[in-house]
C-alpha cells in the first residue's frame, strides 16, 4: 500500500477559488490549528492573489498573516506560498532586486517552500526567481504549468505530454536549483490521459527520489480522475482542500479523494473521522462569508474556454461589484478565441487575467476593437515568449494601439531598465508619502502599487462580501427589482424562461383585498425549480420537486348568533413549553380547565 501525501490548499487556493481571496485571518486560524491536530503536514498559506487581497479588501497585512499562521502550526509544518516567476506576487513583472527581496521576506516571515511558476512557460522567467528562492534558504518547487486545449487545437503541439516534458528538459538544462517539481493545472481542463502520460514521463526523466506534486481544480468536473491519473503516473503528493472550499472551482476534497483511493493500492493514511470534525468546524467558521453559486458548480464550458478556479470567482466578484455579471457567459465564450490567438499561454494568473480582460473588451466593445494593455504586451513578448506564436493580426493591432514593438528580450533586462520599478523607485514613493522605508513596505508598494501605499497610510476599505450584506442588498429592493435583476442575471440560462415565469408568479401573488364568499377552494400551482430563501438574513438554496401546493382562498365567516348568558372564560394559568416545537393537537377548548395528564 503506497501512502500518497497531500497539501491542503484551503487557506490560499480555496479562499481564492470560493471567496475571491477575501477572508479575514482570525476567521481561519482555528481551522488551521485543527487541521494540524488531525494530521495535515503541508499547507498552502499565501501568495498568489491572497497577497494583494489582504491589502485591497481585508484591511490586513499579508506578512502579519504569515507570522500568525507559523505561530499556530509550529516550527515543523511545511507552509507554502505561490509565486509567479518574474511577477512574484504582483500582477506586473518586477525587476531583479524586487524578485530577490520577495524570497528573503517570505523566508523571514515563516514560509518553508515557494511554488514558482510561469504561465507562458518561458524558462528564463523561472531561472532567476528560482535561484533567489534557493539562495534565501527556502525550498524551491519548480512548476510545469498545464492546461487543456479545446477540440481541434491539439495540432499546435502545445499542452501535450511531449510539450510539457520538453519544458521539463529545458529546466534541467538551465540547471535551475529545485527541491521538488509540481505540475499545476489551474483551470482543471487537462485530460486524465495527458496527466498520466506527462507524470509518467517526468518520473523517468527526474533523478530518483525527486518529489512530484500535482495540482488541479474540479471546475470542469475532472479533479478526482486527474488526481488518480497523477498518482498512477508516479506523483508523490497531490493538492486537496476542505469543505466548504472544495469541489467546483476549488480543489478536490480531502475526504472525497480518501474515498476514491479505498480498495486501491494507494491511501492518504488519514483518520477520516478527525477530518469530518475539522471540516465541520471550518464550515461553521466560513458560514458568514458569501459564496457565489458559480464557486461550487462544475462548469463543462470551462473545458472549451479555460478559466482558472481562482480567477473565475475573483472576476465574478468584481463583475458583481460593477453590475456586469450578466456578461459572464459571453465573456467565457469569447475566451476560447482569445486563448488561441494569444499563443496558448497557460490560463493561470496573470495570463488568465489578460485573457478575461481581452475577452471582456471583445464582449463589450466588439471583437478586437480594443487591445487591452496586459494582453497586448503579452502577445508582443514583454512578459516572455508564449508557447506558440500569437496571431499575426492581433500582434499588429497591439503594436499599433500600444505603440510598442514586438520583442524577444529577457523580461528581467526590460524591467531592470524601467525607472518605475525596483527598490529605489519604491523607496522614493514611501519617502514622499512619509511612510517608513522598511523592506516589507518597499515590497508592498512594488507589488500593490497605489493601493499598497494607501494601505500603509491607513486608507483602506473592507471589500469582503458577507451573506448579511447580500441579504440587505436584496431586501433593499422592491420585489419587481429583484425579479428584474434575476431575469437579467440568468437570461442566458437554459430553461430559465420557464423558471422566471414561475418566480414572477410567486413574487407577484398578493393577498385578496376582501374575503371571497363561497366554499373553500384549493388550487394546485406548480412550484418546481430552484429558489433562494432567506432565514435570519442568510440565503439558502431550495429546490422544489414536481408536486402540488395547496393555496386556500379566504372564506367568509358566517355571522355569530349571540348566545344567551355566555359563560365567562376561566382566567387560567400560563403553561410555558419546555422547548420550542410545533403544535400538533389541542386537547381542550379555550376557557376549559386543564387537568393533570392532558
Regions found by a protein language model. Name each.
Residues 1-18, 66:
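N-terminal amphipathic alpha-helix/helix-capping segment at the start of soluble metabolic enzymes
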Residues 5-13, 41-45, 77-84, 112-115, ...:
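Hydrophobic faces of well-ordered beta-strands that scaffold small-molecule active sites
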Residues 116-119, 185, 233-252:
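Glycine-rich phosphate-binding active-site loops on the catalytic face of alpha/beta enzymes
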Residues 578, 584-593:
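Short histidine-centered loop motifs in beta-beta connectors
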Amino acid at each position: 500500500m503506497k501512502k500518497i501525501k497531500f497539501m491542503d490548499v484551503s487557506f490560499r487556493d480555496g479562499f481564492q477559488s470560493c471567496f475571491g481571496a477575501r477572508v479575514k485571518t482570525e476567521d481561519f486560524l482555528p481551522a488551521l490549528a485543527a487541521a494540524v491536530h488531525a494530521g495535515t503536514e503541508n499547507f498552502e498559506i499565501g501568495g498568489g492573489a491572497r497577497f494583494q487581497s489582504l491589502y485591497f479588501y481585508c484591511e490586513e497585512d499579508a506578512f502579519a498573516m504569515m507570522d500568525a499562521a507559523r505561530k499556530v502550526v509550529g516550527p515543523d509544518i511545511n507552509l507554502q506560498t505561490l509565486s509567479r516567476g518574474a511577477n512574484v506576487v504582483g500582477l506586473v513583472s518586477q525587476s531583479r532586486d524586487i524578485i530577490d527581496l520577495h524570497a528573503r521576506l517570505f523566508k523571514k516571515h515563516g514560509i518553508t517552500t515557494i511554488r514558482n511558476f510561469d504561465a507562458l512557460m518561458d524558462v528564463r522567467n523561472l531561472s532567476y526567481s528560482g535561484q533567489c528562492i534557493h539562495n534565501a534558504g527556502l525550498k524551491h518547487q519548480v512548476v510545469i504549468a498545464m492546461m487543456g486545449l479545446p477540440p481541434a487545437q491539439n495540432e499546435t503541439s502545445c499542452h501535450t505530454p511531449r510539450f510539457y516534458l520538453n519544458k521539463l528538459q529545458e529546466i534541467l538544462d538551465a540547471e535551475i536549483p529545485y527541491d521538488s517539481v509540481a505540475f499545476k493545472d489551474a483551470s482543471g481542463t487537462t485530460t486524465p490521459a495527458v496527466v498520466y502520460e506527462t507524470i509518467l514521463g517526468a518520473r523517468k526523466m527526474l533523478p530518483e527520489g525527486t518529489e512530484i506534486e500535482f495540482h488541479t481544480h474540479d471546475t470542469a468536473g475532472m479533479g478526482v480522475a486527474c488526481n488518480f491519473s497523477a498518482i498512477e503516473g508516479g506523483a508523490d503528493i497531490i493538492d486537496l482542500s476542505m469543505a466548504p472550499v472544495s469541489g467546483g472551482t476549488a480543489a478536490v476534497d480531502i475526504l472525497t479523494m480518501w474515498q476514491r483511493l479505498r480498495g486501491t493500492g494507494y491511501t492518504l493514511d488519514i483518520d477520516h473521522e478527525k477530518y469530518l470534525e475539522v471540516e465541520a468546524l471550518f464550515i461553521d467558521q466560513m458560514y458568514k462569508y458569501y459564496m457565489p453559486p458559480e464557486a461550487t458548480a462544475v462548469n463543462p464550458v470551462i473545458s472549451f474556454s479555460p478559466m482558472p478556479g481562482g480567477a473565475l470567482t475573483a472576476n465574478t466578484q468584481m463583475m458583481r461589484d460593477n453590475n456586469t455579471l450578466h456578461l459572464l457567459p459571453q465573456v467565457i465564450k469569447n475566451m476560447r478565441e482569445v486563448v488561441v490567438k494569444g499563443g496558448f499561454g497557460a490560463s493561470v494568473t496573470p495570463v488568465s487575467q489578460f485573457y478575461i480582460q481581452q475577452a471582456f473588451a471583445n464582449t463589450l466593445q466588439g471583437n478586437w476593437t480594443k487591445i487591452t494593455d496586459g494582453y497586448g504586451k503579452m502577445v508582443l513578448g514583454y512578459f516572455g515568449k508564449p508557447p506558440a506564436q500569437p496571431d499575426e493580426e492581433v500582434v499588429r493591432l497591439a503594436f499599433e494601439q500600444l505603440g510598442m514593438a514586438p520583442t524577444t528580450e529577457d523580461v528581467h533586462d526590460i524591467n531592470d531598465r524601467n525607472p518605475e520599478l525596483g527598490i529605489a523607485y519604491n523607496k522614493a514613493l514611501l519617502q514622499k508619502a512619509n511612510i517608513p522605508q522598511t523592506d516589507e513596505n518597499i515590497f508592498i508598494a512594488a507589488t500593490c502599487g497605489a493601493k499598497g501605499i494607501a494601505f500603509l497610510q491607513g486608507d483602506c476599505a473592507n471589500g469582503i462580501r458577507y451573506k448579511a450584506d447580500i441579504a440587505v442588498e436584496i431586501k433593499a429592493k422592491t420585489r419587481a427589482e429583484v425579479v428584474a435583476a434575476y431575469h437579467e442575471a440568468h437570461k442566458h440560462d437554459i430553461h430559465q424562461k420557464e423558471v422566471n415565469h414561475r418566480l414572477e408568479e410567486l413574487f407577484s401573488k398578493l393577498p385578496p383585498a376582501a374575503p371571497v364568499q363561497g366554499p373553500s377552494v384549493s388550487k394546485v400551482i406548480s412550484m418546481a425549480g430552484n429558489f433562494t430563501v432567506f432565514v435570519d438574513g442568510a440565503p439558502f438554496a431550495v429546490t422544489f420537486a414536481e408536486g402540488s401546493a395547496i393555496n386556500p382562498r379566504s372564506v367568509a365567516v358566517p355571522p355569530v348568533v349571540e348566545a344567551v348568558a355566555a359563560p365567562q372564560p376561566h382566567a387560567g394559568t400560563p403553561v410555558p413549553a419546555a422547548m420550542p416545537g410545533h403544535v400538533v393537537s389541542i386537547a381542550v377548548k379555550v376557557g376549559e380547565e386543564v387537568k393533570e395528564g392532558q
